[in-house]
From Swiss-Prot:
Gene Ontology molecular function terms on file: 3-dehydroquinate dehydratase activity
Pathway in which this enzyme or protein is active: Aromatic compound metabolism; 3,4-dihydroxybenzoate biosynthesis; 3,4-dihydroxybenzoate from 3-dehydroquinate: step 1/2
EC number: 4.2.1.10
Domain of life: Eukaryota
Keyword annotations of the record: Lyase, Quinate metabolism
Claim: Lyase is one of the keywords in the record: yes
EC category: lyase
Protein name as it appears in the record: Catabolic 3-dehydroquinase
Residue sites binding substrate per the record: N75, H81, D88, V102, S103, R112
Site positions per UniProt: Transition state stabilizer: R19
Main function: Is involved in the catabolism of quinate. Allows the utilization of quinate as carbon source via the beta-ketoadipate pathway.
Oligomer and partners: Homododecamer. Adopts a ring-like structure, composed of an arrangement of two hexameric rings stacked on top of one another.
Reaction equation(s) it catalyzes: 3-dehydroquinate = 3-dehydroshikimate + H2O
Organism: Penicillium rubens (strain ATCC 28089 / DSM 1075 / NRRL 1951 / Wisconsin 54-1255) (Penicillium chrysogenum)
């Protein structure tokens, strides 16, 4: 059976394509999810996506992933800067994760510069627009393939 990836998007990412397009672009979350599933499938992996504006729902979904997914890609949105609960959930399931941000959070308001996830993430993708999702999925899939060959991989 192929590897399994969980793609999680946090608050306001359901508005991709319409919310501040000068910052986030015009591609919708539905397009991002569909493209991500296609990329994963091209590597023999399955990608499931989940989006919520609610911290507890994200925690619940991460906990439900324990033992069922091989990698997580998460764009925590504004929870990046506030959520110890999501951080703790990610650490509790023992699944490597990639932290992803569409915008360059380090070039924005100073309060956006701190992340509760970066120090525990297997990798961080910042400021590549929605192309960052492609990079994240490709990275996770290539690392799955490298691990199957016995090579040391980051995820």
């Amino acid at each position: 059976m192929g590897k399994s990836i969980l793609l999680i998007n946090g608050p306001n990412l359901n508005l991709l394509g319409t919310r501040e397009p000068h910052v986030y672009g015009h591609t919708t979350l539905s397009d991002v999810e569909s493209n991500s599933r296609e990329i994963a499938a091209s590597h023999g992996a399955v990608l499931e996506s989940f989006q919520s504006n609610h911290e507890g729902a994200i925690v619940d979904r991460i906990q439900a992933a324990r033992g069922k997914v091989d990698g997580i890609i998460i764009n925590p949105g504004a929870y990046t800067h506030t959520s110890v609960a999501i951080r703790d959930a990610l650490l509790s399931v023992d699944v490597p994760f990639i932290e992803l941000h569409v915008s360059n959070v380090h070039a924005r308001e100073p309060w956006r510069h701190h992340s509760y996830f970066s120090d525990k993430a297997a990798g961080i993708i910042v400021g590549l627009g929605v192309y960052g999702y492609k990079v994240a999925v490709e990275h996770v899939c290539v690392n799955f393939e490298e691990k199957e060959k016995g090579a040391k991989a980051a995820l």
